[in-house]
A protein has these predicted regions:
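Vicinal oxygen chelate
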Residues: 1-4, 90-129
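N-terminal beta-strand motif that seeds the catalytic metal site of vicinal oxygen chelate
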Residues: 1-22, 72-74, 126-129
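Conserved active-site tyrosine of GNAT-family acetyltransferases
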Residues: 21-26, 88, 115
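Conserved acetyl-CoA-binding loop of GNAT-fold acetyltransferases
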Residues: 26-33, 93-94
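Conserved short beta-strand elements that form part of the metal-binding/catalytic scaffold
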Residues: 33-65, 117-124
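Exposed loop/turn and edge beta-strand positions of beta-sandwich/beta-sheet ligand-binding modules
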Residues: 40, 70, 104
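Mid-chain, well-packed structural core segment of small domains
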Residues: 67-88
Length: 129
């Protein structure tokens, strides 16, 4: 028995919040809206390639819930650290870079509009100064 990789994560929020969250994941991180089967409530699935990685679910009772109370962060393996850093700057998104020399890993940390911390990991890449 083994876990292979992160399958998906779900963000539940009000309709208005979900619109902002959806746009963030599409515009800033490059996800695409894709197929979502008929489920009990409204929502969307966002894809990275052929993987439905971000599930968005509408729940009008979630207007004041703080994501950081339950979810610390979401990490994704990526390529193109400098391109991502430039895009975050273009959107005026503050981020904290980190580098772990023992495993040659550069990381970018920032928050999405729902308050969820996003960690982007870049193996073998360094952030330009």
């Amino acid at each position: 028995m083994e876990i292979k990789y992160l399958d998906h994560f779900n963000i539940k929020a009000s309709k208005g919040q979900l619109s902002e969250v959806r746009d963030f994941y599409i515009d800033v991180l490059g996800f695409k809206v894709g197929f979502r089967p008929k489920l009990s409530g409204p929502g969307q699935w966002l894809y990275a390639g052929s993987n439905a990685m971000v599930h968005l679910s509408e729940d009008e009772n979630r207007t004041s819930r703080k994501a950081e109370d339950f979810l610390d962060h979401i990490a994704m393996r990526c390529v193109g650290v400098n391109e991502f850093a430039k895009k975050l700057d273009e959107y005026s998104i503050q981020f904290r870079p980190a580098y772990i020399p023992e495993i040659d890993l550069t990381q970018l940390f920032f928050k999405d509009p729902a308050g969820v911390t996003i960690e982007l990991n870049f193996k073998g890449e360094k952030l330009s100064e």
